Each structure stands twice: as structure tokens, then as C-alpha cells.
Amino acid sequence: MDWITFTKKFLLNYYQMKKLFLPLGILLVNYAYCQQNARQPQTTPVSSYETYQPPIFTDPQRLAKIKAAIPVVEKLYRDYAEKNHFPGMAFGLVVDNQVIYSGGYGYTDLANKTKASGKSLFRIASMSKSVTTMAILKLRDEGKLRLDDPAYLYIPELKAMPLLTKDAPAITIRNLMTHAAGFPEDNPWGDRQLDGKDEELINLIKSGISNSNVPGVQYEYSNLGFAMLGKIIGNVTGIPYQQYINENIFKPLGMDHTLWEYSKVPADLLAHGYRWEEGQWKEEALLHDGTYGAMGGILTSVEDFGKYMAFHLSAWPAKNDPEAGPIKRSSVREMQLPWVFNNLNAKFKYPNGRECALVSSYGYGLRTSRDCQERVFTGHTGGLPGFGSQWWVMPEYGIGVIANGNLTYAGMNTVNFAVMDTLISLAGLKPRELPVSPILKLRKDELVKLLPDWNNAAKSAVFAVNFFPDRSIELRKKASQALFAKIGKIRNITELKPLNQLRGNFQIEGENGSIDVYFTLTPENPGLVQQLDLKEVIK
């Protein structure tokens, strides 16, 4: 066969094959398209914020019940102050966006018998720390620094400071905010440094700091680290950290009576600090404002600091409302996250003796604790020679408490835990309830129609691609029919209880028992059922 004859036959065969397979190819493409189209969700994809509904409190009498419990709350504080021999104490209760109650016990000035009240200005010590980190986050949000930047970019003297080992990473701003810079615990020493000067801090850095660990591996409380954060704020903004915080945090929140320098506080509002020694009260000398004030120098009242607490509460839950605070709500929530593990107290007991394990972590200038009932507390203690203070907020319950005392290292944690626990019990408080998202409700309704026989389930556009490969439709049908037969005639299907936007459970109640139906959706838009668990409810 010559080359020309071969070429003619090849082309003839090619065109014949093309005529044969082209229609078949088109048919296969159309079939694949139809199959793909058939399994696509019938719900039109939407932006999440268009359908999102935030969790809400459902008890219309919630605030009234809280107010009715105030006499019990006040008695708890007064009894605690008397039992622990406090010269004076101020305390308050924050609900949602306001201080609904404040009170006092004893005196802020023993010599002049000045009574303590919600307006008295106490030095709140380390309760100041979260204010400093809030300022750092504001600068971060404005693009003026980054949390994982080496701190030496903002305090150049840190560049040459030796760390514990040669392989130690540079100290970051985040390390300073979470007590993970490798500095030693320094409470007794740091508490006497409030009036220190910038040059003293820089000289300390230049002379070398004794490290207890390498950065980023372990929590260890450091006042020195927060003094550095104050210095970073000053270096980045070009103004003292006190001025920056006054203008950008206190003023927007209306905290007009919160100060840094005790000599500027009106005499009738200033709480004097005391220690009980040798059978008598001895006044502690107040330190002037200085470089270390960023870790513990603020003077404020229950009523003023309550506005700051209310702002923390306002960040929850996430919502579509316009921003209205000094920093973004998402940044406030970020502050409260458990960034560094602190401890687990498996035998923690509430003051009433009820045992309930408690895990504690540190966020950005905040301590966050979660108890055995999944209740979350966020706040901070404060202690100095002459003072002790503490605040908690419970974002999911929308409540907060604060207590300030003028006794050296007065412990307020115990009484605040007691108040929160008692208040929840007396008022019957419940956390916010999450409304059912539209897609979750739709998938529930679809599941109810398909169970227990699974008719046409594979073509229903309800299930994700993993669902039937994970467990065949035959096995699912057999198991569900057995469960339905066991519970008998269906009498009721309960409301869906959402765990979040894309997972939840409900129950199918029959004459002889009930089935719990738990399901989760995929990250696709709209979400498809990727997991379904049917379990008999054992009563």
C-alpha cells in the first residue's frame, strides 16, 4: 500500500468514527450534566448575613428577676467584706449595656470616715491590663502594628537583649499580651514599680533581663511585659500611652471619672489603701503614675468601669449591627479567647461547697474560665499594696460583677464567683438561645419526610457526596426502620435545637419511645447533610 492510499483510508475511517462517537459523546456530556444538576441543592445560595439571626434571651422577665435578687447580692458582698475585715469596699452589677446596681461598704478614707460607694475611685491594679491590650488591638486594627511582630521593632533596645537560649524566638507583641514572653513571675517586685520612668525601663532592658523560660512556650505572669506594651503604644503613636487610652478608649466609652494619677482625684472620691498590721490599720503610700501604669495604674469607680464591662458584653453575640465602640466587636471577642492555657482545677468548689471542675486560660490581658456546666467567665483580678479588686462578665448570660476593696491584696474572686452563681440560680437565668437558621430548618423538614424508608433519598439533593459512601442507603434504611418500629406510632416531632448555624438535633416521639436525630451540614452553600445519627432515647 502506497502512502497516498494509506492516507485516504485513514481519513475515511476517521470521519466515519467521528460520525459514530460524536453523538455518543454529546449524550454522555448531557447525562453527566443532568446527573450533576439533579444533585445540586434546590436552595439558592445566599450570603450568611442575610439570614443570620443572633442568639437572644427568651425570658421577658429576665431583668426584673435580676433586680429582685439585688438584696441577696448586696448581702453577699457586705457579709464578705465584714468577714474579711475590709476597711471599705465598692461593688456593682452590670446587665447588658448598663450598671443596674452599685453599692458600698465601710470607708475609703478611715481618717475622715468617707463612705465607700459606686462612685469611689479605687486603684484597680491589674484590672488595667485588658485596657492596655485593647489599645494594642486598636492599633493593630488600624494597621499600625502586628501582634506577631517582634517586639524589638517597636522597642529597638530589645533587639540586643539576650534570651534564655540561642534557639529562642524573638519576643512578639502577642507573647507580651498573653504572659508568654519568658519573663519570670514578678508580682511583688512589679507592684512597687508603678511610678517608674521610661528611661528606667529602657536601662533595665539594656542591662539584660533574667528570663525564666524561652518565649512562646509557657504562661508566666509578667507585669514587666505589660510595661513594655505601654511603651510600644507610646512609641507607635508618639504620645504617652495614658493619653492615647484616655482619648481612644475612656472618652468614647464615657469613662469621664477614670484617671491615672491619684493626685488628680477629688479627695472625697479617692480610696486610700490600707494593710492590717500589728492590730491596727496602716495606710499604704500611693504611688504616682508612671511607665508601669500600663500593667496596673488605673484609678476608677464601679460605675465608670462598669461602662467598660458593658462594652465587653456588647461584643456578644456576633451580629450585623453597626460598630459603636472604640474597637471592633470582633477584636473584643478576640481578647477574650483562651490564648494560653493557665490551669485546670478538677476539684474547684463554689463558695456554697458545690464541686465543679474549672479550667482557666489567659487571653489578651484577660483571664477566661470555663466550669463543668460550660459556663464561661471572663475578667481579671487586681492586687497592689493597699488594694484588691476583681471583675467578671459572663457574655452568654449578659451579666457582670465588679468588686473593689482598699485592703492589701484583698481577694475578690471568691465573692464574685458566689454572686454570679447565686444570681443565676435565684433569677433562673439561662444563656441566650440560638434561633434555627433557615437552612437547618429546611434540612430537618426534608429528613422528616425521608425517614425511615429513605425513598428516593439518593436523588433528593439533601445529602453531601460523602453521605452514602460512608454508610450505604440499605444499611441506613434497615437501622432506621428498626428504630421506628421500636417506638411505635409517631405522636410528635419536637422543635429543632440548634447547636450552631449548621448542626442541631430534634426528637421523634412515638407511643413506646423516642428517637434523637442529630445532624450536621457541610460548608457548601447551601449546606448539605454530611452526618446523621439516629439514637434511641433511653429514659
Kindly give the residue locations of the regions a language model identified:
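Short, conserved catalytic-motif segment at the N-terminal edge
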Residues: 58, 62-122, 144-146, 157-160, ...
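Sec-dependent signal peptide cleavage junction
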Residues: 33-68
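Short, gly/Ser/Thr-rich active-site loops of penicillin-recognizing serine hydrolases
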Residues: 347, 375, 403-475, 539
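Surface-exposed, charged secondary-structure patches
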Residues: 357, 478-522, 529-531
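Short active-site loop at a secondary-structure junction
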Residues: 80-92, 111-175, 212-224, 293-296
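Short, well-ordered beta-strand elements
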Residues: 379-380, 390-393, 397-406, 516-518, ...
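Bacterial Sec-dependent N-terminal signal peptides
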Residues: 1-39
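Short, surface-exposed loop or secondary-structure junction motifs
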Residues: 109, 163-383
